[in-house]
């Protein structure tokens, strides 16, 4: 039933949507919101703001009511609890509301004539253990699935609500191929089953021992049947015994899988992570892939008396850095870190400022640069209330209040908070001016001073006011100019409480107070 459901849904997708699709921008914004990573932001403040922006783009609180936003959230959760095939089919049709989702699922059930409980749990377990493909069924085994009841009457299973292999009937007649085709035909080609079984080997000893073994019953009663909901009883002695007696189960394709080890690994995974059933299905499929031998290998071609020992899953150690740069040999823990590092060698700067066109290697660098245009200063000094664009600038400024000066000039004894400040100061003693202008030959001790000087030749004014359009060569000039529009006057006189936009204006004003004292 599960195979028929998956194939029918795929056939419906291939034929195209019969419903009118709506704008997919909402789904795009939802995926961006769910897939956003903390490492994409420069810090917690930026990460929170980015998540807020993505959430508003998805839910659109200014356009939607509270009830509509709540419906979107419930709709998203409802899609995640659907079976994987139905969820994929519904998302392809991009439903815009709950009525649309319910009608899509009801139409699909009526089209495929599927009951509301969808799929038998036994079939779902077999579907996860054996992907759709050319199946080879051992001659002495049959299933209690309705799609395969043409093979003969099924014997009553010794364990309730669990499927185990059963010995086949004495005689099987597969001459009525037409009846079988009518029963299984869903309107698209199905893989052809190999029905030419030899009845001489139906009493092979391993089959009888397998169906009578307590280990097989315990495996099928355990939490590996996650949708049946039978609790697994932890018994160390039985687990050890299971590893010594026929540690396998046989799928529809004839592949032997390690039952006890598969059960043990899956229970550990389930106890570690509390995930929804659809996520457990995907994790179970991964465990099966790790233990699955070569596809198409039948029990007759494999040695079933020897335990199947798959290669253990290799876990990364905490300090392991497997990704190495071929240019410089530097190693990284993540491939994304290596990709970002390789841009240094290639000179690639993918992040461009829309205001001035300057490019950057990292998105965090671009975000900090854009503060120059917006005037944003998120870091504030708690002592003097002065604000800064970078946290490092705030830390350096706070040293002026604590009188922490760790860098001292040996020539004049002057101390500085930063090593870079001491380095610039030393050039005043040596007279070093390494930065020279190619236009007029003038030299400067600092690169920033040369950059500002060159703008007098090029007449470049990169700092533009967003209010009036006036441009400036230096950013401090733009900051002072913006105070005209904002009305900010940060410099306050301590005598008369009068405020000024520039420090020079405050100094000139304070002279009037001192004149009276003289």
UniProtKB/Swiss-Prot annotation:
Name the Gene3D superfamilies for this protein. Classic Zinc Finger, DNA breaking-rejoining enzymes
Keyword Nucleus appears in the UniProt entry: yes
- Region: Disordered, residue numbers: 292-325
Query: Which keywords are on file for this protein?
Result: DNA-binding, Metal-binding, Nucleus, Repeat, Transcription, Transcription regulation, Zinc, Zinc-finger
Q: Describe, by residue range, where the zinc fingers (C2H2-type) fall in the chain.
A: 323-345, 351-373, 379-401, 407-429, 435-457, 463-485, 491-513
Domain SCAN box per the UniProt entry, residue ranges: 30-112
One GO term of the cellular component aspect?
nucleus
| GO MF annotation terms | DNA-binding transcription factor activity, RNA polymerase II-specific; RNA polymerase II cis-regulatory region sequence-specific DNA binding; zinc ion binding
Please state the protein's primary subcellular location.
nucleus
Which superkingdom does the taxonomy of this entry point to?
Eukaryota
In the UniProt record, does the keyword Zinc-finger occur? yes
In its UniProt record, which GO terms are filed under biological process? spermatogonial cell division
Q: What SMART domains does this protein map onto?
A: SCAN (SM00431), ZnF_C2H2 (SM00355)
UniProt cross-references to Pfam families, sorted A to Z: SCAN, zf-C2H2
Q: Polar residues: which segments have biased composition?
A: 292-304
Record localization: Nucleus
Q: What does this chain do? A: May be involved in transcriptional regulation.
Family, as annotated: Belongs to the krueppel C2H2-type zinc-finger protein family.
- Tell me the protein's name: Zinc finger protein 449
This chain is encoded by the gene named ZNF449
């Amino acid at each position: 039933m599960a195979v028929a459901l998956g194939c029918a849904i795929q056939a419906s997708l291939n034929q195209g949507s019969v419903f009118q699709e709506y704008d997919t921008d909402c789904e795009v914004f939802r995926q961006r919101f769910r897939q956003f990573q903390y490492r994409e932001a420069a810090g917690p403040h930026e990460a929170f703001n980015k998540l807020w922006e993505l959430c508003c783009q998805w839910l659109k609180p200014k356009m939607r009511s509270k009830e509509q936003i709540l419906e979107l959230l419930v709709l998203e959760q409802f899609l995640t609890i659907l079976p994987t095939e139905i969820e994929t089919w519904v998302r392809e049709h991009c439903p815009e509301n709950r009525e649309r989702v319910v009608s899509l699922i009801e139409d699909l059930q009526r089209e495929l004539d599927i009951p509301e409980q969808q799929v038998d749990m036994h079939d779902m377990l077999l579907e996860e253990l054996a992907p759709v493909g050319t199946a080879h069924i051992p001659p002495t085994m049959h299933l209690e699935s309705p799609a395969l009841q043409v093979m003969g009457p099924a014997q009553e299973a010794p364990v309730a609500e669990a499927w185990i292999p059963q010995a086949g009937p004495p005689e099987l007649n597969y001459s009525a191929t037409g009846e079988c085709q009518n029963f299984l035909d869903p309107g698209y080609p199905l893989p052809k089953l190999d029905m030419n079984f030899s009845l001489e080997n139906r009493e092979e000893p391993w089959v009888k021992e397998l169906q009578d073994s307590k280990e097989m019953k315990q495996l099928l009663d355990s939490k590996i049947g996650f949708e049946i909901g039978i609790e697994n009883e932890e018994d160390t002695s039985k687990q050890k015994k299971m590893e010594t007696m026929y540690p396998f189960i046989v799928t529809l394709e004839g592949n032997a899988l390690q039952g006890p080890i598969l059960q043990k690994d899956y229970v550990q995974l389930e106890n570690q992570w509390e995930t929804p059933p659809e996520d457990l299905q995907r994790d179970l499929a991964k465990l099966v892939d790790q233990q699955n031998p070569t596809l198409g290998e039948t029990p007759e071609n494999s040695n079933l008396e020897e335990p199947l020992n798959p290669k253990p899953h290799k876990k990364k150690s905490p300090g392991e850095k497997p990704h190495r740069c071929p240019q410089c040999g530097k190693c990284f823990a993540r491939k994304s870190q290596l990709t970002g590092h390789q841009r240094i060698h290639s000179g690639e700067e993918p992040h461009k400022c829309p205001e001035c066109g300057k490019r950057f290697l990292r998105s965090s660098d671009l975000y900090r640069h854009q503060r120059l245009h917006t005037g944003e200063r998120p870091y504030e000094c708690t002592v003097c209330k002065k604000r800064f664009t970078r946290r490092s600038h705030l830390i350096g400024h706070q040293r002026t209040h604590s009188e922490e000066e760790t860098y001292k000039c040996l020539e004049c004894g002057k101390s500085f908070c930063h090593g870079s400040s001491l380095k610039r100061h030393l050039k005043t003693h040596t007279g070093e001016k390494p930065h020279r202008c190619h236009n007029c030959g003038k030299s400067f001790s600092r690169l920033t001073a040369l950059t500002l000087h060159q703008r007098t030749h090029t007449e470049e004014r990169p700092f533009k006011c967003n209010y009036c359009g006036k441009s400036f060569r230096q950013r401090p000039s733009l900051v002072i100019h913006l105070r005209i529009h904002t009305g900010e006057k940060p410099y306050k006189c301590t005598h008369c409480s009068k405020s000024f936009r520039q420090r020079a204006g405050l100094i000139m004003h304070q002279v009037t107070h001192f004149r009276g004292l003289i």
